[in-house]
Amino acid sequence: RQDLRAAEDALWRWMTAAALVRARGDGGVVMVVAESTIPTVQSLIRWDPVGHAEAELAARAEVGLPPSVHMAAIDGAAEAVSALLDEVRLPDGADVLGPVDLPPGVRRPAGTPPDVPVTRMLVRVPREHGLTLASALRRGVGVLSARQNTEPVRVQVDPLHIG
């Protein structure tokens, strides 16, 4: 599946299932029917979740994906998302990405009319600016809420699914 955590979830499930098998001395066997060169399969064969996590982190750092960076997802009507981004002073080094579709299974922001298309913008910052990003977005949401003239927006810092 297309998800940043797909390999992590697969390894966790496989290791959980393998842990239920009786000991090798008692005749227990775990079989993996998959291409042995796949890194996740290698991690299972070596029983190395730490090595797998280190490799995943390095790969994500190379392309600027969490958890090597902090990321905020801003969901809502295009005008409301734009209004929030216009209001916020983003930290140095911030990248605004999108719009992207909402990930499958993610609900629309509460209060968004069903006929209004929902968009998602992503804001990516270096790890050291995560608190600054969260504070700026909190302030921006507060300002827009006080104005009461925009559609609702949902802000998630470091969401599990980014789009």
Language-model-derived ranges and their functions:
Residues 1-9, 16-163:
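Accessory helical-bundle/CTD segments and flexible terminal tails appended to RecA-like ATPase motors
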